[in-house]
């Protein structure tokens, strides 16, 4: 009997799973993080923004513009049409506005067009200007009240408080070394804390002590806050003190001071906590959080019945809090009302909630805990009750009551998703528009004005366009494979506007925090400067309405201490109150715990507790990691650094033409493929009626017919082949949501990023030294690792000042051979095989009349006027871009296509390349075991197994021990056994096959029990000395292919200033011979090599032309001249005002340009120019008519002229034409 149990993944794949824990909670939809947020934006977000900004009234109050409703009309293009036309997939937004004239009572209602709103596709992306983009969610600090504590140089703890709004002024409290408390209003100079309380209307010391009770800090602060001006009351003086800090030097009155404070903190247009800020303030100051763990100093009773809820001396634990929590939300439970003086900022009574507890440090001492009462969530401004409660928390913190906040705690960081980011952007646009509306209201005639005349939509359209086009959070979608796409949509970035910058982010913010558990993946993050700042959402995590990450837990009954199937989603700060056991904790059949002492998590500690103290248990082990990390089998056996690489490598895997699902999987592959958006899903139950490569038809149970069109050979964002293949056959029954067609990198409805080759851990003639990989030729011949790549090239025919460009077959100086695959319009035919430099689209551009060179004068003499008119600006195949023309698309204004201004015709050519695996390509497994192909050996030379099976890949065994990614060894043993048994297996992360399971499985498969075998040398037939570990590992071909990287320069462009060759493959540049390389030649004394590298091969302009001429003629190369960089240095020093001259050995001044001149020739005339001049004189000596006749009859002159022109172009290195190339 085999280990494990059979699990079906979709309709087409069965695996034997080693999991022991039952999945009681299905995975949430993995793209909901995007789609749900955008749905909220359309349903509620847009309305919220309009309600915030409108109604708008003019200064005199004559006119009021109000929002009624909005609707989106049908999009102009479908998703596919948007891609094809380089358009944005969007819908016109029409807003119904109501304009009321208060003088006449007239009401005008009108629909106003508010621009196009980009729409989200079903899979959670946007199409902007034809390219697919993703809006990455942002991880930012939440608005709320935060408490901090630092130790000064004397070892004394100094506390601070910050009240951070979503929008508006900050309020900060702090203590100094003398234990006096201060307040800062909006980052200004500090004032004694009591000044703020007095400004609220509580002027006397006795009132302040009545509210806050006795405290050493408070007494010291009151002593510091002396009454300076007896003419003013304490309240008026406090208001003026704050005014003086906010507006120093300005004349102040009590009224102006009061109105300034009101506008800063109590005006909804200037100060906004947002719903999340109000929730955080209420939560932080609530007595629910503050009472836990303290002993009551008074009896708490039901205010209605008088029933005792908790007696004095009761310790408030979770069970007591369960009884109290509903009462703490009531307005009549332990509330106290304080009445401020009429001079205060807000003269209304202030109601707070107060409960007394005993101090932990001095047991008999009573401490008063004040909460802000129950303030409704729609109160977005700060209230006097909030200020009093936050001051109380701050003062009691110094008595040891309360907690300081950790800013990296996920309870204090929230997610801004696409809906909220779009809403904020729209609010910016509407706020700009509001100013325009007010201005127009005062200018226009009130009797005749309409809403349309008041609105200017440009600011709104501009802000939305700017967000999608250039925001740091709007990113070009990673479309290497479905996993990369899915991960991109689930990414969380701490960068971007309002977030961190990578230069200022320290180690703490990048580090894994204990609150990441089940919320953010501790493994998947980029290597490099963004490490820790960009994270991935964990598999089961969801985002609540406030933007906080929540993770599910199974509740443990407090009565029976058994694990129930009730699921609670907890935020990070809720989780802090509970003790949580791991999902792997052994349970009995009835849900009770097997062991008497269980290792659990509580905050950042691991604690050993008895079962009666456990509150929750994890739902499933894989809830800790992201989707990509959950696709790594035996993740628990890999070092975390290598697991990080393994997660990142999977996203870089290239879609292969015939992929296979992994023999050893984790069970996550099916959901990753299903939710990625690349698979075609059935929309309803039914039966398949017809299937071919392009279309699937399904007859529903109600007899309606659904037709599904498959995407064939479309270019993805990453220039990979996006291709769908049917996964069903005629007569199959399908169910709603079933995968009926595989996307790229999918097989049988599962993610299939690579192949399952036979792998041996052995060295082979040093060819796999230092992570190099040796492959069998079988992988090349049988197209095991062959992928298809599609690149597109555009050619635009524009209007120029000298006339329109023309797409044509009539190209000057081009032989018929170069035009053989062009049609009558000069466009390449579909199916043509093209190579570097071939013409794809023939195009000519009108020339201006300029001074003609010798060659041009010659051509003009031969061909008359026509040669002067146009120059060849055809689209050619770039270096390394050769392949087969897959498709050609032509867009013209006449056909009604939308083109950029000045463009008359756009031709887009798609070239497809079939790339086999080759030496230099990067490959990797799923455990961070990456390497580069160093040798592709013939099959007959490969080591082979005793049954004659040749090995496909040889990996270096030295790559395992130091990297500590032992998962790959367990994978090859399990994979070998699975292949022997002809089955697929699943080993979920942290709940998969143990080492014993692997060896049991190996024995049952009849494979050698040590996982090793005798391996024979394919060349000699001799067995290797030792037994070798051989098995099956899932191995991927990555997107870093040698074809994209390899590059060599012949003649190419030069930098304009330094005249040195440009750098980089894209510029067809050279290899930089830098400072250290010069030292190397100096060290060897290679003087002449050094000289030619610094002159001819770099920036000696004249010398390199002469060298070229000498090589062409077969003469000796002349001495080098002066490098251009020397002239640049001279000019730079002269620009600093230094009189720098060049002297010869006799100390006579030498002109730099004279140093380049030869006695008998000018520097600018090169060999080819002189050849062309001689040819011109010779030709002119003959009769013109005779020459013309010869040209017509033989066409040979045309060929000669083309050759001369081509040679001349080659030599003119610093010419304009060359630079443009």
UniProtKB/Swiss-Prot annotation:
Which cysteine pairs are joined by S-S bonds? none
Q: Does the keyword ATP-binding apply?
A: no
Per the record's keyword annotation, is Transferase included, yes or no? yes
Region Disordered: list its residue ranges. 1176-1221
Q: What InterPro entries does this protein's entry cite? A: DNA-dir_RNA_pol_bsu_ext_1_sf, DNA-dir_RNA_pol_bsu_external_1, DNA-dir_RNA_pol_su2, DNA-dir_RNAP_su2_dom, DNA-dir_RNAP_su2_hyb_sf, RNA_pol_bsu_bac, RNA_pol_bsu_CS, RNA_pol_bsu_protrusion
| Oligomeric and partner information | The RNAP catalytic core consists of 2 alpha, 1 beta, 1 beta' and 1 omega subunit. When a sigma factor is associated with the core the holoenzyme is formed, which can initiate transcription.
Know the name of this protein? DNA-directed RNA polymerase subunit beta
From what organism does this protein derive?
Lactobacillus delbrueckii subsp. bulgaricus (strain ATCC 11842 / DSM 20081 / BCRC 10696 / JCM 1002 / NBRC 13953 / NCIMB 11778 / NCTC 12712 / WDCM 00102 / Lb 14)
């Amino acid at each position: 009997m085999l280990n494990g149990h059979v699990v079906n993944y979709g309709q087409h794949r069965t695996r034997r799973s080693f999991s022991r824990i039952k999945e009681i909670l299905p995975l949430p939809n993995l793209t909901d993080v995007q789609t749900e947020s955008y749905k909220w934006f359309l349903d509620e977000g847009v309305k919220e923004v309009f309600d915030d900004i409108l109604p708008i009234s003019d200064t005199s109050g004559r006119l009021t513009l109000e929002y009624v409703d909005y609707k989106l009309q049908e999009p102009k293009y479908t998703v596919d049409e948007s891609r094809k036309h380089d358009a944005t997939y969007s819908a016109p937004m029409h807003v119904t506005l109501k304009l009321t004239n208060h003088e006449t009572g007239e009401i005008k209602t009108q629909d106003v067009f508010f621009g196009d709103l980009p729409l989200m596709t079903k899979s959670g992306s946007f199409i902007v200007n034809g390219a697919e983009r993703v809006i990455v969610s942002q991880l930012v600090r939440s608005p709320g009240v935060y408490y901090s504590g630092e130790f000064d140089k004397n070892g004394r703890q100094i506390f601070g408080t910050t009240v951070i709004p979503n929008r508006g002024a900050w309020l900060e409290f702090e203590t100094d070394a003398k234990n006096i408390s201060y307040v800062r209003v909006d980052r200004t100079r500090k004032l004694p804390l009591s000044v703020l309380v007095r400004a609220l209307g509580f002027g006397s010391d006795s009132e302040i002590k009545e509210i806050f009770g006795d405290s050493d800090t408070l007494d010291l602060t009151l002593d510091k806050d002396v009454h300076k001006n007896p003419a003013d009351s304490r309240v008026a003086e406090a208001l003026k003190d704050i005014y003086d800090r906010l507006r120093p030097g300005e004349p102040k009155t009590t009224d102006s001071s009061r109105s300034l404070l009101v506008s800063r903190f109590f005006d909804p247009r200037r100060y906004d906590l947002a719903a999340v800020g109000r929730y955080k303030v209420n939560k932080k100051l609530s007595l629910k959080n503050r009472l836990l763990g303290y002993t009551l100093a008074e009896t708490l009773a039901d205010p209605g019945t008088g029933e005792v809820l908790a007696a004095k001396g009761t310790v408030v634990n979770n069970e007591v809090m369960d009884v109290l929590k509903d009462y703490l939300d009531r307005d009549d439970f332990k509330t106290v009302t304080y009445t401020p003086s009429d001079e205060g900022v807000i003269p209304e009574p202030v109601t707070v909630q107060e409960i007394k507890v005993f101090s932990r440090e001095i047991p008999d001492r009573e401490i008063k805990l004040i909460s802000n009462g129950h303030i409704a969530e729609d109160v977005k401004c700060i209230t006097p009750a909030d200020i009093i409660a936050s001051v109380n928390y701050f003062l009691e913190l110094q008595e040891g009551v309360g907690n300081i906040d950790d800013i990296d705690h996920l309870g204090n960081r929230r997610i801004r998703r696409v809906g909220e980011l779009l809403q904020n952007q729209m609010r910016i646009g509407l706020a700009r528009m509001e100013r325009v509306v007010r201005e127009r209201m005062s200018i226009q005639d009130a009797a005749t004005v309409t809403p349309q005349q008041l609105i200017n939509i440009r600011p709104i359209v501009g802000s939305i366009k700017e967000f999608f086009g250039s925001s740091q959070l709007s990113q070009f979608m990673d479309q290497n494979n479905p996993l990369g796409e899915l991960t991109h949509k689930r990414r969380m970035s701490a960068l971007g506007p309002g977030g961190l910058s990578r230069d200022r982010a320290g180690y703490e913010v990048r580090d894994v925090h204990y609150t990441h558990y089940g919320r953010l993946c501790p493994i998947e993050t980029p290597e490099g400067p963004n490490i820790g700042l960009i994270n991935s959402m964990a598999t089961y995590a969801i985002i609540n309405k406030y933007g906080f990450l929540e993770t599910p837990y199974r509740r443990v009954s407090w009565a029976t201490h058994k694990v129930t199937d009730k699921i609670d989603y907890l935020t990070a700060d809720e989780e802090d109150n509970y003790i949580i056991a791991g999902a792997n904790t052994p349970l009995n059949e009835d849900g009770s715990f097997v062991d008497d002492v269980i290792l659990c998590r509580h905050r950042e500690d691991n604690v050993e507790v008895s079962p009666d103290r456990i509150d929750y248990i994890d739902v499933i082990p894989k809830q800790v990691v992201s989707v990509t990390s959950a696709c790594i089998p035996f993740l628990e056996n890999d070092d975390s650094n290598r697991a990080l690489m393994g997660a990142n490598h999977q996203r870089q895997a290239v879609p292969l033409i015939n992929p296979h699902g992994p023999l050893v999987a984790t069970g996550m592959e099916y959901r990753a493929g299903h939710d990625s958006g690349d698979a075609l899903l059935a929309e309803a139950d039914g039966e398949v009626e017809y299937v071919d490569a392009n279309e699937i038809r399904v007859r529903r149970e109600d007899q309606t017919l659904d037709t599904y069109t498959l995407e064939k050979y479309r270019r993805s964002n990453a220039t990979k082949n996006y291709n769908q293949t049917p996964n069903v056959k005629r007569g199959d029954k399908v169910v709603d949501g079933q995968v009926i067609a595989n996307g790229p990198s999918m097989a049988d409805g599962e993610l299939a990023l690579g192949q399952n080759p036979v792998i041996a851990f052995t060295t082979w003639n040093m060819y796999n030294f230092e992570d190099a990989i040796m492959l069998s030729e079988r992988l090349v011949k049988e197209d095991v690792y062959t992928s298809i790549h599609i690149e597109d090239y555009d050619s635009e025919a524009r209007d120029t000042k000298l006339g329109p460009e023309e797409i044509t077959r009539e190209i000057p100086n081009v032989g018929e051979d170069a035009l053989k695959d062009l049609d009558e319009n000069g466009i390449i035919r579909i199916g043509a095989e093209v190579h570097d430099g071939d013409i794809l689209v023939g195009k000519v551009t009108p020339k201006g009349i300029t001074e003609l060179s010798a060659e041009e004068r010659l051509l003009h003499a031969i061909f008359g006027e026509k040669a002067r008119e146009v120059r060849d600006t055809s689209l050619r195949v770039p270096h390394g871009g050769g392949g087969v023309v897959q498709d050609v698309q032509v867009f013209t204004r006449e056909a009604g296509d939308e083109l950029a201004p000045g463009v008359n015709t756009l031709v887009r050519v798609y070239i497809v390349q079939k790339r086999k695996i080759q030496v230099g390509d990067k490959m990797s497994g799923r455990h961070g075991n990456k390497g580069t192909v160093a040798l592709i050996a013939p099959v007959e030379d490969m080591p082979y197994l005793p049954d004659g099976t040749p090995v496909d890949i040889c990996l270096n065994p030295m790559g395992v021990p130091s990297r500590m990614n032992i998962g790959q060894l367990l994978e090859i043993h399990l994979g070998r056994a699975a292949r022997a048994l002809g089955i697929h297996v699943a080993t979920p992360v942290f709940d998969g096959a143990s080492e014993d399971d692997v060896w049991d499985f190996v024995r049952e498969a009849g494979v050698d029990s040590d996982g090793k075998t005798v391996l024979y040398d394919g060349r000699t037939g001799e067995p290797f000395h030792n037994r070798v570990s051989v098995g099956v590992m899932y191995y991927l071909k990555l997107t870093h292919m040698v074809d994209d990287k390899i590059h060599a320069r012949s003649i190419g462009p030069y930098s304009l200033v330094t005249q040195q060759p440009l750098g980089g493959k894209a510029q067809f540049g050279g290899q930089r011979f830098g400072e250290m390389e010069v030292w190397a030649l100096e060290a060897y004394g290679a003087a002449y090599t050094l000289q030619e590298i610094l002159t001819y091969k770099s920036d000696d302009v004249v010398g390199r032309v002469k060298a070229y001429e000498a090589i062409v003629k077969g003469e000796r190369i002349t001495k080098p001249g002066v490098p251009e960089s020397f002239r640049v240095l001279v000019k730079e020093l002269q620009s600093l005002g230094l009189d720098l001259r060049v002297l010869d050995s006799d100390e006579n001044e030498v002109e730099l340009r004279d140093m380049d001149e030869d006695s008998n020739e000018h520097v600018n005339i090169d060999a080819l120019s002189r050849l062309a001049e001689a040819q011109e004189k010779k030709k002119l000596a003959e009769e013109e008519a005779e020459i013309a006749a010869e040209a017509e009859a033989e066409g040979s002159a045309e060929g000669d002229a083309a050759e001369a022109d081509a040679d001349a172009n080659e030599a003119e290195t610093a010419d304009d034409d060359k630079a443009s190339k």
